[in-house]
UniProtKB/Swiss-Prot annotation:
It comes from Acinetobacter baylyi (strain ATCC 33305 / BD413 / ADP1). Residues 1-18 have a biased composition (Polar residues). The gene is argH. The keyword Transmembrane helix does not apply. Gene3D superfamilies: Fumarase/aspartase (C-terminal domain) (1.10.40.30), Fumarase/aspartase (Central domain) (1.20.200.10), Fumarase/aspartase (N-terminal domain) (1.10.275.10). Pfam families: ASL_C2 (PF14698), Lyase_1 (PF00206). This is Argininosuccinate lyase. It catalyses: 2-(N(omega)-L-arginino)succinate = fumarate + L-arginine. The lineage of its organism: Bacteria, Pseudomonadati, Pseudomonadota, Gammaproteobacteria, Moraxellales.
Amino acid sequence: MTTSSHSSEQPTSTQTSGMWGGRFTEATDAFVAEFTASVQFDQRFYKQDIAGSIAHATMLAKVGVLTEAERDDIIQGLSAIKSEIEAGQFEWRIDLEDVHMNIESRLTQRIGITGKKLHTGRSRNDQVATDIRLYLRDEIDDILTILLRLQKGLLGLAAQNTQTIMPGFTHLQTAQPVTFGHHLMAWFEMFVRDTERLQDCRKRVNRMPLGSAALAGTTYPIDRAFTAELLGFEAVSENSLDAVSDRDFAIEFNAAASLIMMHLSRMSEELILWTSAQFKFVNIPDRFCTGSSIMPQKKNPDVPELIRGKSGRVFGDLISLLTLMKGQPLAYNKDNQEDKEPLFDAIDTVRGSLMAFADMVPALGPNIEIMREAALRGFSTATDLADYLVKKGVAFRDAHEIVGKAVALGVQEEKDLSELSLEQLQQFSDLITADVFDKALTLEASVNARDHIGGTSPKQVEAAIARAYDRLEKLYA
């Protein structure tokens, strides 16, 4: 096997158009070469591109297109190139346009004419489609691992707060008492759905387009099932036209990523409110916050604020891909070069945001007494008083009106329902007796009464947490 050093000289005109030089009478314009190049960002595919090429060469040798010696030279050369890249010794050249041609060119430099045989039976159209799928498959697996860490963090914090009572809100107004553990489990459910979506998306990512060539397939006797097995794909694509032009899987991932970011943004919004001086429900450790250059007292929840802001860019990445694809005829078009940066950005943003939350959530410190005091304000047990009357034979709509009048008195006297005297309550209904204070108007009575699957009672939250661990075990099996 021959090797040569990787030249840093600028390419000649012939080299500039080396991929398609036979058809053209002049070299590519320098600006056009730079404008159409993608190597600046698609070089992050290098591992997947090399893995795909090794599998392709192995398959070509199996069907007799390459000799075993040629296969071995190619594999050895590609492995050496991978080491060069990881050692920071590889020179990425814009004139070679993309990650594929940079690696192939370097391979030919290292092993000679055998390197030029690697692309037999393959096009960059099916090559890049394969690279993207391999890359996204790896990234989904990584994101799922981080999601699991966040989910376990939520479960751990919820288990510590099954008895911690806080106000539940609708319209950001006090509604009914809930446990903090129950609220945390609501967040958990959002991320379970995200897990399911990513796992479902991965099934469609894990289809191999390699072998589709430019658009119509290839005349060589390739064994696509063998290549798919080498690369860990579950199946091969069924239609070559669709395979090289399909980016549904990337759009689907960005949609799932957008939902993850939406959930993180909602969670961030609550944390931002809860850490404010007006709420004081939760403390975020200093290591996740920053200060002010002018106001010495400030402790800003920058991590949730930034994640709330970053959600918008991921939504934009989804729209970018949808807009990119909406006008393309079959099959591959150069437009698809623009699919990578929105995908990369969504991946990077979601991964980073999830990592931040996975680290931060277990460290959140609830201010239990402040939460409880807040639940005592805003007449959070009003519905319980109405239910108390219903159980004594009052129609719910009439009970609603009775309690509304009691609330009006409480507003007038600046007292919670539990702070009104029995005599004051009885002026609205003589069915109200002394047991109302224990059965309906305490926070504990309110949350304990909601003792059913999905309810906020400590008993049900504990059961939900136990079920959640079982669900995670099955989800990630």
